[in-house]
């Protein structure tokens, strides 16, 4: 979904971020009022948005130069002095702007482009001195009492600093939000974000970190280029906090009783097998040879992205086959198989007839034209089959564990489920899902603690903010850059 300002070519090509934000506010406010904004002036806009008048004046001048807004000076009728200056949209009845409603995340987008004072707690500010948490707890094993954010005995809990969302951060968050799905997940590259916001890439990177620090980006999966993937380049993915203003969906966390047995993800195991195979240590390797050939020698960030893709595939299975996943019977999903092939098998390049060896023409007629990016060739189908099997294993793991809440009927209510990736070094000790709609028996935020094998109790937390920051990081509920985590003494 494009924001309003994106539909005006002169704004996208010539205006800076402040002017883009201002135009979106003017159009959105007009839609809210069901009429053109009357007496639109520098002073009224500055007051409405709590901005400096100089910023508003400069932005309106940009919009005037782009022929999007016209400057109107009221006649003085013989009186001395300058007439009152107001501004009006001059877009006319542009069909591109006829539909002025946000189809998704409307409440949050309307709040971003309004005079609402959007203030959020800065993550980590409650820790006091940097490194305080890291020094106080070396183990990450779950302890309910330690995990709840409560003041130490004899001390008052710090309120923590608050961060006000600037107009440029609002614009960036809105651009991300406008392209996200129902769960707030969006895949977009830095160059595209820079183009849409009118900012430089480095400025966008800095502001993305700010959004993370304010808890508005729950999870960031960095993009990368690798021959492993068919597209060659996978853009970054973000899970946005769509509940920042008002609850939109629901979250459930499952914490296992088998702490050591669930310490690794499928990608962790694959990476270990690849390292051992490369070193010639073949004993105990579980990964299929085709996957080893695909992933061997790849850096850790490729395995992290591979795990994210597996979780996307598993989310599809959980949403479509919840009941079937309860048994060990094979599940055939042609849509998922096609999805995996698109992600891992490159499309064939058309060759000129003169470039094809005549002796090979007949032999190629019945063969698949696509090859894996690593050149695995005829093993492409086998490799994709292995990836399909891994996704099925993950889906069944999540089905078993969340199915322990046997008072909840995911199938009957046709829940749409999305796995929220947790910390890469936390394994499956705690797993998190987003789901819509809300389900009977689970609140907006639910924590299932496995007290013994197969038996869970539901926690009393009303929101993820009741956990300390390390737990929220572990569960995938918030994310911070590595440097920030290190400075705060977090893992």
Regions inferred by a protein language model and the residue ranges of each:
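Positively charged, structured surface patches that bind polyanionic biopolymers
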Residues: 1-16, 32-33, 90-163
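Electrostatic interaction modules used in gene-expression and signaling proteins
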Residues: 10-17, 21, 35-38, 51, ...
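Short glycine/serine- and small hydrophobic-enriched flexible loop segments
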Residues: 27-28, 178
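Extended, helix-rich scaffolding/adaptor regions
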Residues: 31-34, 42
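Intrinsically disordered, low-complexity N-terminal extensions of nucleic-acid-metabolism proteins
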Residues: 85, 96-98, 174
